[in-house]
Amino acid sequence: MENNFDSMLNVSAVPQDDKKAAFIAKSKNNRNRCYELSEQITNEVASDSGKFQQYLDVQARFDRYTANNALLILAQRPDAERLGDYGYWREQGVFVKRAERQNPVLIMEPGKEYEREDGSIGTYYNARELYDISQTTMKERPQPQTELDERLLIRALINNPPASIVTAEPDQMPEDKGAIFEPEENCIYVRKGMNAQEIFQCLTPELALAGFADGDPEYDRDEDAFHAYCASYLLCKKYGIDTQAYDFRYAPDFFEGMEPQEVRAELSKVRDAANQISSRMAKVFEQNRMSQRQQEQAAQRQEGEQNRENGPKREESQSRTHMQGREPGQPRGNWQRREAAQER
């Protein structure tokens, strides 16, 4: 029988350099796409108050992402909830849907450093492809609604503050202020009688201002009032505090005349201010979790010890019950048969 496979075995080699070139071309296209999207969405955010608030919502959900990457997420998938690359989702036991593989969310990540002609050091940026949870095979799972204890929330908020915090009588405070930072005294005064949500809303912008002042008694609080206001919004969104009273209609006025790079710098300042406060809070939450875990472990150990102590007592009690009505040395069960015979 004629061998029909011979003609199949004449295959030209595919130069590996072609694969490398294709990868480099794709990476370059993705990087250029990120630059274009970033410029476009930055201009939209700076000129549209509604779009600006949308950006803040995205940044609140992805608080560990840079301001530029939050802008890129807003431009590509503003409703994203959870992002990861192929490897991340594979570790979760799910996969990116076939129809979504060509629709990644592009973000920028720092790569290698290089030396510029003037001797300064620059950083190459590479585009990375991510996918939202909605683009994967993971079935919808209801997210557990964990409500933070209000006292724990406020205790975390005032942990290691950049300025002293002192309560004040309502008549000692400005009528429209629940809290106010005084740079000359490096002190934040907080109106007495407020509930947890009011304290959080009023105290967060003042903590941000105190962080900006960094102990400078001549600091002008008006310089960063907008940044502090936005940082407060980010924190409220993150920790489930009502944000309906926040109004960003004047945001375009703040950004008027700025270049996209300048706008992103201002957004980064807001993001960093919120993260400084959130980082201090996270330490308190972690300490609380560790304390609860230790208490649970101690309770489990105590329960185990009680069970071990009660075990021999139960066995001893059962032994005494069986011995009742039996003469010494008499086999178990004989006394029952003897009493039954006597009755007969």
What are these regions, as identified by a protein language model?
Residues 1-323, 328-343:
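N-terminal accessory/interface modules of nucleic-acid-binding and processing proteins
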